[in-house]
A protein has these predicted regions:
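A short, Lys/Arg-rich alpha-helix, primarily the initiator
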Residues: 1-20
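The alpha-helix within a helix-turn-helix
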Residues: 15, 26, 56
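Short, basic-rich loop-to-helix N-cap that marks the start of a DNA-contacting helix
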Residues: 43-54
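Residues within the helices of the helix-turn-helix
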Residues: 12, 23, 53
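Short, charged recognition helix plus adjacent turn
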Residues: 13, 38, 67-79
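Short alpha-helical DNA-recognition segment
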Residues: 19-38
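The DNA-recognition helices of helix-turn-helix-type DNA-binding domains
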Residues: 32, 43, 70-74
Length: 79
């Protein structure tokens, strides 16, 4: 799977787990709605660590927790 697909799947999964909307994440993280939408819709070509960190803060998790997923297991990303 490509990296942007893995990021999208994980973000959507976490939003579902937290019963949070993209708008709520925007208000909690400060990451623009368009950036969140781009990630969710796999329209991003690159997401920097600062954005991921801010999203994680909005979700109430660490970067480690974000990447603690089979989507990011060794050999899964073919980007």
């Amino acid at each position: 799977m490509k990296l942007n697909e893995a990021l999208s799947r994980r973000l959507c999964e976490l939003l579902d787990e937290k019963k949070m909307t993209a708008y709520a994440l925007y208000t909690r993280s400060g990451v623009s709605q368009s950036t969140i939408s781009d990630i969710k819709n796999k329209n991003n070509t690159a997401v920097n660590v600062r954005i991921l960190f801010e999203l994680c803060e909005g979700l109430g998790i660490s970067l480690q927790e974000f990447f603690d997923s089979p989507y990011f297991s060794f050999g899964t990303i073919i980007d």
